[in-house]
Amino acid sequence: MSEPLKPRIDFAEPLKEEPTSAFKAQQTFSEAESRTFAPAAIDERPEDEGVAEAAVDAALRPKRSLWRKMVMGGLALFGASVVGQGVQWTMNAWQTQDWVALGGCAAGALIIGAGVGSVVTEWRRLWRLRQRAHERDEARELLHSHSVGKGRAFCEKLAQQAGIDQSHPALQRWYAAIHETQNDREIVGLYAHLVQPVLDAQARREISRFAAESTLMIAVSSLALVDMAFIAWRNLRLINRIATLYGIELGYYSRLRLFRLVLLNIAFAGASELVREVGMDWMSQDLAARLSTRAAQGIGAGLLTARLGIKAMELCRPLPWIDNDKPRLGDFRRQLIGQLKETLQKSKSSPEK
């Protein structure tokens, strides 16, 4: 038997059709556009350290006021007058055969020439330090570029500036790994993984040595003024050593500028990182109960020296940090604690013998 038909069901509202997503039109790129195409970094975060450093540098930079321009103009006019008067004195001494005055003019000319030469040398070294920041920006662009032809020359220039010989094993491995079909991003990336770690390892060893010396000096010494002078002197030497390793010759003003940039970077960007990496670990291990007050102060001084070296390394390095290869403060912290414990154990065991 057939089943009876079900009655019709009427709905109050008509059925709603689900909206379908419309497809976008096809986009085609030319060959020239495909070469310069670079993927956008969605999760890329702005560099807080650079923003803070630029803000403070702009705040501390003196404004070009009218009085400053008048003073600079007066100094320039005075210098020109001194040079003109010196030329006139020299001519008069030569005409009157006053050899004593002529010798004084010659000595003054030598002093002025030495002063001008030192100013030019300082300016050139300061310009070289500023160029390192531009080279780092250029390297960052090459690491995101798909073009061909600039990466090899750029890396060879960096190797020459750092004093790396052509027969160096790391540079030979880099030459063997690159070929003509690779773009600039791949060539610079290979240089960053094969050649740059050689210089970074030397800089890490220098930071470890200077931080250990600062830690032991503060932990052993009991004179605050001597400690402060020693730490300041060693920190300046550390900055000079790191700059020399990366091929930067520092003068007086360039050294002050680098030291100022490092301190500003530490003050604005390093405080939170220092608390995060050091404070929680110290609280968890209760180092204050295990070590003496002088030892704790020594560890703090060593960590600040290590932090100073890391930031100097970052400012002198020609390439940006990639693949989390930036040295961490925790690595130096564990090393400093181990060295300090060994020193304290040796000092305690020596009187017993």
UniProtKB/Swiss-Prot annotation:
<dbReference type="InterPro" id="IPR006507">
    <property type="entry name" value="UPF0283"/>
</dbReference>
<dbReference type="GO" id="GO:0005886">
    <property type="term" value="C:plasma membrane"/>
</dbReference>
<keyword id="KW-1003">Cell membrane</keyword>
<feature type="transmembrane region" description="Helical">
    <location>
        <begin position="70"/>
        <end position="90"/>
    </location>
</feature>
<dbReference type="InterPro" id="IPR021147">
    <property type="entry name" value="DUF697"/>
</dbReference>
<keyword id="KW-0997">Cell inner membrane</keyword>
<feature type="transmembrane region" description="Helical">
    <location>
        <begin position="213"/>
        <end position="233"/>
    </location>
</feature>
<dbReference type="Pfam" id="PF05128">
    <property type="entry name" value="DUF697"/>
</dbReference>
<feature type="transmembrane region" description="Helical">
    <location>
        <begin position="100"/>
        <end position="120"/>
    </location>
</feature>
<comment type="similarity">
    <text>Belongs to the UPF0283 family.</text>
</comment>
<protein>
    <recommendedName>
        <fullName>UPF0283 membrane protein YcjF</fullName>
    </recommendedName>
</protein>
<keyword id="KW-0472">Membrane</keyword>
<keyword id="KW-1133">Transmembrane helix</keyword>
<keyword id="KW-0812">Transmembrane</keyword>
<feature type="region of interest" description="Disordered">
    <location>
        <begin position="1"/>
        <end position="35"/>
    </location>
</feature>
<feature type="compositionally biased region" description="Basic and acidic residues">
    <location>
        <begin position="1"/>
        <end position="19"/>
    </location>
</feature>
